Amino acid sequence: MTAKRIIACLDVKNGRVVKGVNFLNLKDKGDPVELASRYEEEGADEIVFLDITATIEGRKALLEVVKNTASVLSIPLTVGGGIRTIEDVSRILGNGADKVSINTAAVENKKIITEASEQFGAQAIVVAIDVKRVNNSFIVFTRSGTYNTGIDAIQWAKEVEKLGAGEILLTSIDKDGTREGYDIELTKEVNNSVNIPVIASGGAGKMEHFYEVLKVADAALAAGVFHDGVIKIPELKRFLLEKGIEVRV
């Protein structure tokens, strides 16, 4: 059995780490290079950077941050946000990231998944799927959670696997930042539909939430609870081991 992964997520805006609730009301949480290094020391298995500005100025700042962070990390670094073209993918991997996360562009131009996967290997391509419940269905939203695509999330997960994604980063927008727990039903349905790893995201509030979701996902991602020190990664891993979830320590 493969060990489950604990992933620290850093939302980066203009070169700084920020955090909000349901994608809104952003507060400054510090320097990405420092935070990423700290999380690695604490035992995070991977780091995810999501660039939430994706403006031209923001992009330049991001590449600088990616380069500086990748140079100090030995754990995998995934970078997403505003990736629209194969050139974007190439630039981010070229600056030291191990994987890229593609979200809106994957929906609007499916070819990018296959092209990126063929060029850089499926292991480097993560497709991020942001989901809201609409009339009892799980629906894919893009453009930072603002645009209802009308696409069924379970069907989309199956499709991105076929197109060449190596991994799915699954975020519940309903749960994002609430600290009420992950969307277990959503995660379970997606995980049961695909053979590639699923990273659960959105809603971590206490250690039990990680335990619950790691029964149905390959990895659990969190941001706010780590930034605010509500949950310490070494304690979380001990807790999970005691509960019988295999994690790397």
UniProtKB/Swiss-Prot annotation:
<comment type="subunit">
    <text>Heterodimer of HisH and HisF.</text>
</comment>
<dbReference type="InterPro" id="IPR050064">
    <property type="entry name" value="IGPS_HisA/HisF"/>
</dbReference>
<keyword id="KW-0368">Histidine biosynthesis</keyword>
<keyword id="KW-0963">Cytoplasm</keyword>
<dbReference type="GO" id="GO:0000105">
    <property type="term" value="P:L-histidine biosynthetic process"/>
</dbReference>
<dbReference type="Pfam" id="PF00977">
    <property type="entry name" value="His_biosynth"/>
</dbReference>
<keyword id="KW-0456">Lyase</keyword>
<dbReference type="InterPro" id="IPR013785">
    <property type="entry name" value="Aldolase_TIM"/>
</dbReference>
<dbReference type="InterPro" id="IPR011060">
    <property type="entry name" value="RibuloseP-bd_barrel"/>
</dbReference>
<comment type="function">
    <text>IGPS catalyzes the conversion of PRFAR and glutamine to IGP, AICAR and glutamate. The HisF subunit catalyzes the cyclization activity that produces IGP and AICAR from PRFAR using the ammonia provided by the HisH subunit.</text>
</comment>
<dbReference type="GO" id="GO:0016829">
    <property type="term" value="F:lyase activity"/>
</dbReference>
<dbReference type="InterPro" id="IPR006062">
    <property type="entry name" value="His_biosynth"/>
</dbReference>
<feature type="active site">
    <location>
        <position position="11"/>
    </location>
</feature>
<keyword id="KW-0028">Amino-acid biosynthesis</keyword>
<feature type="active site">
    <location>
        <position position="130"/>
    </location>
</feature>
<comment type="pathway">
    <text>Amino-acid biosynthesis; L-histidine biosynthesis; L-histidine from 5-phospho-alpha-D-ribose 1-diphosphate: step 5/9.</text>
</comment>
<protein>
    <recommendedName>
        <fullName>Imidazole glycerol phosphate synthase subunit HisF</fullName>
        <ecNumber>4.3.2.10</ecNumber>
    </recommendedName>
</protein>
<dbReference type="InterPro" id="IPR004651">
    <property type="entry name" value="HisF"/>
</dbReference>
<dbReference type="GO" id="GO:0005737">
    <property type="term" value="C:cytoplasm"/>
</dbReference>
<dbReference type="GO" id="GO:0000107">
    <property type="term" value="F:imidazoleglycerol-phosphate synthase activity"/>
</dbReference>
<comment type="similarity">
    <text>Belongs to the HisA/HisF family.</text>
</comment>
